């Protein structure tokens, strides 16, 4: 049974982590509530990310371009490319995310969930957690 991680307006169901696949992939389903967005745009140098739309429409900002991903549609985000996402609709959206190679596992998201559960998260702690796992945060003004 997939592990569920609650990140406020985001919910992840982790199917496979790096330890399950000998580092080949991380795979999780993400539900994004209406009007929610990724709190901190970022990039990563060690893995690529593929997103497959399952339900609703999520808007991904990739390398300065908005890309709408609906059911059956995909976006590929290669390493080093700044990205973020939002749900600009009034309905929850779902997508399947695959990171290759698998380097995060669920622990990064669990650590972020702890920071978010404490109320308004400390931006410095969020940045430190991101950097520890290889995500490089970028100011929203640069996206």
Language-model features: locations:
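A short glycine-rich, His/Asp/Glu-containing loop-to-beta-strand
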Residues: 5-41, 47-48
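Structural signal for conserved beta-strand scaffold positions within catalytic alpha/beta enzyme cores
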Residues: 6, 14, 97, 137-139
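Short strand-coil-strand connectors
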Residues: 8, 61-65
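Short acidic-glycine-tyrosine-enriched beta hairpin
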Residues: 64-82
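Ligand-binding loop in jelly-roll beta-barrel domains
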Residues: 79-106
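Acidic/histidine-enriched, glycine/proline-rich intrinsically disordered or flexible terminal extensions
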Residues: 110-143
């Amino acid at each position: 049974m997939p592990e569920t991680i609650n990140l406020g307006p985001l919910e992840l169901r982790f199917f496979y982590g790096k330890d399950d696949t000998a580092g080949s992939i991380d795979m999780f389903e993400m539900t994004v509530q209406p009007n929610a967005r990724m709190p901190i745009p970022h990039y990563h140098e060690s893995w690529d990310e593929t997103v497959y739309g399952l339900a609703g429409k999520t808007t991904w900002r990739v390398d300065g371009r908005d890309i709408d991903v609906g059911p059956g549609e995909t976006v590929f985000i290669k390493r080093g490319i700044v990205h973020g996402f939002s749900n600009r609709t009034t309905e929850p959206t779902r997508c399947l995310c695959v990171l290759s190679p698998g380097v995060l596992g669920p622990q990064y998201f669990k650590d972020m969930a702890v920071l978010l559960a404490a109320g308004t998260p400390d931006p410095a702690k969020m940045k430190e957690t991101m950097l520890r796992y290889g995500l490089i945060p970028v100011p929203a003004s640069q996206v």
